[in-house]
């Protein structure tokens, strides 16, 4: 089934509306009533209580292992999503994702997630030569729902970012949240890099190091 996007006339030329949001055009229901986004991805509308209850139930069931489980779920989600996006990108833009500017590809990948309520982001490649990528996340769906509980909670995002950035870089990456809205911060911050660097950062985080201290030690 070919991808169908809304179009608009700009001067004498008709263009596809790529990263364009209107509720009645972004969210659609199929013939069975399932809610989909414009890219034919299944979505759900859930209240904050659902997110909080899911998080707490998992922690009560498996304890400290919950963070790793959520990270792995996020990683698999990100891996599947970026692979699907790679196919959609070529269909939508008529060129391979690998031929496009990496930042254009990343923004186009994240846009539907932001439109669906997963938050806004910015990323920092200034230390890429050292093998490090930083991602700032604003209005995390998880952290905003959970509130200030004094610890990081956005493990899904950490895994998802590691998978997506790693796929685009053609290099396996690991991820770690080093600052979170649920710790009283204004936004969440994630560190992406090799498993060795992330393991070191994770050790320092467990010892109580702040995001600034972790970055300085790296």
Residue ranges and their predicted role:
Residues 1-134, 139-156, 174-218:
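N-terminal accessory segment detector
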Residues 154-170:
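Active-site helix/loop of acyl-thioester processing domains in fatty-acid/polyketide metabolism
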């Amino acid at each position: 089934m070919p991808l169908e996007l809304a179009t608009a006339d700009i001067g004498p030329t008709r263009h596809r509306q790529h990263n364009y949001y209107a509720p009645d055009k972004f969210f659609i229901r199929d013939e069975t009533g399932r809610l989909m986004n414009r890219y034919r991805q299944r979505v759900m509308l859930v209240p904050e209580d659902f997110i909080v209850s899911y998080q707490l139930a998992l922690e009560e069931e498996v304890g400290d292992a919950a963070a790793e489980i959520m990270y792995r779920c996020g990683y698999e989600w990100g891996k599947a999503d970026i692979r699907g996006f790679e196919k959609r990108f070529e269909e939508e833009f008529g060129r391979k994702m690998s031929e496009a500017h990496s930042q254009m590809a990343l923004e186009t990948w994240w846009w539907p997630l932001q439109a669906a309520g997963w938050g806004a982001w910015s990323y920092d490649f200034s230390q890429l030569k050292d093998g490090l990528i930083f991602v700032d996340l604003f209005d995390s769906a998880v952290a905003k729902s959970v509130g200030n509980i004094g610890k990081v909670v956005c493990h899904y995002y950490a895994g998802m970012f590691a998978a997506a950035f790693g796929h685009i870089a053609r290099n396996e990456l690991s991820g770690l949240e080093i600052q979170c809205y649920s710790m009283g911060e204004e936004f969440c911050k994630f560190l992406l890099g090799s498993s060795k660097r992330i393991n070191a950062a994770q050790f320092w985080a467990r010892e109580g190091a702040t995001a600034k201290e972790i970055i300085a030690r790296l």
